[in-house]
């Protein structure tokens, strides 16, 4: 036996909650189904498969033949089911009670197709030591992470061809390291190269094991892989040669643990894969991180010292993207509220799907349809519990928010940030109208002369960013909310707002307002630099009404502007100036139909809020919402009303 190498081959198949149906369909046709069909033809090939809950639900509803074939392969011993949180949460980011329930749901599904699952695929391989207790309590014996985790703990690469034990609070679990070299070989290099590498590991130790476990989408969905993997026959050759090679002993995780013991005890730090430590850093620091890595590579010492190069951790995304943080903290709030409500918890668990909370190579938090799916389920879960009025630091930034509820809406105000309306969620439509992501500089945009100088002057990557995209790029001074108050000089234009060039007098969008609660509403006030703003907001059955009283004591005329950022995402808007007593917008596939209403005829400026982000297909200029601005000349004192109405039809 010492003249062989044990080899565990695993895949992880996942589609985000809320992804488009055509994406599921294409992934199924190009990847999931042909992979499983090919596997069926090679009865000696063994594969550990993890399938995420959103994908399982789609398969059950649309392609039950996949589940049937998977069940058959499990029965004949070819497939081991590896579980995770059912709706693919980052386990470290959700409460312990929710982790246990998420894992229980997936273990029950695995049992329904004939497998008693004992192992966990760790979503995005985000590890923190206290997960050990949760996993053991969930009946899990082993977990799979990257070899980078082990090297970060001080182990050498040569020590990473065995699983180890790790412990926390007296609970012990086995941990398998994924071989990074195999991740880059499979399926991108010829099969000969894979076999050559596996053969090179043989040294007479019969317990030695090489582990490959990576995204199943690499086998057909990633650019160029369908032709390579299926049409040119890579997968068939791989299955054929791996399963017939006398020097390779194919195993499943459970088979390995039945035959061999883990090698010893290790303590892994909080970690994910190496690239995540770059992506999770704030943009300026991520830029420095990339420069540092490149400098080490130029000097030829990166590989030698790589394990000591560490950036951020996954939870840094909640610092990097405040919109993600708010969504996450609302999820934690709802989790506590519905802990004993099984019906509500179904929706809560869906709202924990990880993809919409972060951003790396793929769109993630930048994709409005993924965030909409989170809010849809959060609002459903929240609606099982009546809140009334809540004063609480919802987002954990040290300042109180005020949540007001009526039969149809949740409204959350942030007095510390310009008295803005930071959430306006409809119980009927299951949308948050204020789900608008701010425009931010990302480290892969290249260098920008000034982060807030309006139109971006991008140098390093300007040849890669098409001109028609680059001319629309701007970065925001403030977060994107409703009822944001601006005091700016006369002569300020729509274009100034659109490209963040407006010169704010007094920083009203982010200064703190005082507040008092009213019956069904709130009054917010601020006096600053001789400008006094009072806004009284009341929730009504079909939206909210606000009355503004603004007093200019300076003697100098200015422009007072109220901004409402609305998550209009399915109709592509253009900048423009509107006038009237009513502005009606019908966003059929996102937030639906709504109206802005005024007592008198008003001018309204509008422009689309477009972010620039990277994805697997290149550059994405995505409309996150539309900014509606009501500009009014302020000489001494003005009083006006506006209404946001959820319109029918």
Curated annotation (Swiss-Prot):
It comes from the Archaea. Optimum temperature is 100 degrees Celsius. Inactive below 40 degrees Celsius. Extremely thermostable. Keywords: Carbohydrate metabolism, Glycosidase, Hydrolase. GO terms for biological process: carbohydrate metabolic process. The keyword Hydrolase applies. The keyword Hydrolase applies. One of its GO terms (molecular function) is carbohydrate binding. It catalyses: Endohydrolysis of (1->4)-alpha-D-glucosidic linkages in polysaccharides containing three or more (1->4)-alpha-linked D-glucose units. Optimum pH is 6.5-7.5. The active site is at residues 124, 215. Homodimer. This is Alpha-amylase. It comes from Pyrococcus furiosus (strain ATCC 43587 / DSM 3638 / JCM 8422 / Vc1). The gene is amyA.
């Amino acid at each position: 036996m010492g003249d062989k190498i044990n080899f565990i081959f695993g895949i992880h198949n996942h589609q985000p909650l809320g992804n488009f149906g055509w994406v599921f369909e294409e992934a199924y046709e190009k990847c999931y189904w042909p992979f499983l069909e090919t596997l069926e033809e090679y009865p000696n090939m063994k594969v550990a498969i993890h399938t995420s809950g959103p994908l399982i639900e789609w398969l059950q509803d649309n392609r039950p033949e996949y589940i049937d074939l998977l069940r058959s392969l499990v029965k004949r011993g070819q497939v081991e089911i590896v579980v995770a949180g059912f709706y693919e949460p980052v386990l470290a980011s959700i409460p312990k009670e929710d982790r246990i329930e998420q894992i229980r749901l997936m273990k029950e599904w695995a049992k329904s197709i004939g497998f008693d699952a004992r192992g966990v695929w760790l979503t995005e391989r985000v590890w923190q030591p206290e997960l050990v207790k949760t996993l053991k309590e969930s009946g899990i014996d082993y977990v799979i992470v990257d070899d980078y985790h082990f090297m970060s703990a001080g182990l050498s690469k040569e020590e990473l061809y065995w699983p180890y034990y790790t412990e926390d609070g007296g609970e012990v679990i086995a941990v398998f390291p994924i071989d990074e070299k195999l991740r880059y070989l499979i399926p991108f290099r010829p099969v000969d190269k894979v076999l050559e590498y596996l053969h090179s590991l043989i040294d007479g130790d019969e317990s030695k094991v090489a582990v490959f476990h990576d995204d199943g989408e690499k086998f057909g969905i990633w650019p160029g892989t369908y032709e390579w993997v299926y049409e040119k026959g890579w997968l068939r050759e791989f299955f054929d040669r791996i399963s017939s090679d006398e020097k390779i002993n194919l195993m499943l995780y459970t088979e390995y643990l039945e035959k061999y013991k883990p090698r010893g005890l290790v303590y892994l730090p909080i970690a994910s894969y190496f690239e995540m430590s770059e992506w999770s850093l704030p943009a300026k620091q991520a830029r420095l991180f990339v420069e540092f890595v490149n400098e080490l590579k130029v000097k030829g010492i990166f590989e030698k010292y790589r394990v000591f190069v560490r950036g951020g951790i996954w939870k840094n995304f909640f610092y990097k993207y405040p919109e993600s943080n708010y969504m996450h903290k609302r999820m934690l709030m709802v989790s506590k509220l519905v802990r004993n409500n099984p019906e509500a918890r179904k929706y809560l668990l869906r709202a924990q799907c990880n993809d919409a909370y972060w951003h790396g190579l793929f769109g993630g938090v930048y994709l409005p349809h993924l965030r909409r799916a989170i809010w849809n389920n959060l609002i459903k879960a929240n609606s099982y519990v009546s809140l009334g009025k809540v004063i609480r630091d919802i987002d954990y930034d040290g300042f109180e928010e005020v949540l007001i509820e009526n039969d149809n809406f949740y409204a959350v105000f942030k007095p510390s940030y310009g008295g803005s309306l930071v959430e306006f969620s409809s119980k009927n439509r299951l949308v948050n109208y204020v789900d608008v992501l701010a425009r931010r500089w990302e480290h892969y945009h290249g260098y920008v002369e000034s982060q807030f100088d309006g139109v971006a002057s991008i140098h390093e990557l300007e040849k890669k960013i098409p001109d028609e995209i680059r001319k629309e790029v701007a970065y925001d001074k403030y977060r994107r909310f409703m009822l944001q108050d601006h005091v700016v000089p006369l002569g300020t234009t729509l274009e100034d707002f659109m490209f963040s060039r407006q010169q704010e007098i007094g920083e009203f969008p982010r200064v703190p307002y005082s507040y008092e609660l009213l019956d069904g509403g709130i009054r917010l006030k601020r006096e600053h630099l001789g400008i006094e703003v009072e806004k009284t907001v009341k929730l009504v059955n079909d939206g909210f009404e606000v009355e503004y009283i603004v007093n200019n004591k300076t003697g100098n005329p200015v422009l007072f502007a109220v901004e409402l950022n609305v998550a209009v995402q399915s109709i592509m808007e253009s900048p423009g100036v509107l006038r009237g007593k009513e502005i009606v917008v019908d966003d059929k596939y996102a937030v639906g139909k709504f109206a802005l209403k005024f007592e008198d005829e008003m001018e309204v400026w509008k422009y689309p809020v477009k972010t620039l982000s990277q994805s697997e297909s290149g550059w994405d200029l995505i409309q996150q919402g539309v900014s509606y601005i009501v500009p009014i000349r302020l000489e001494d004192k003005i009083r006006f009303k506006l209404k946001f109405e959820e319109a029918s039809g």
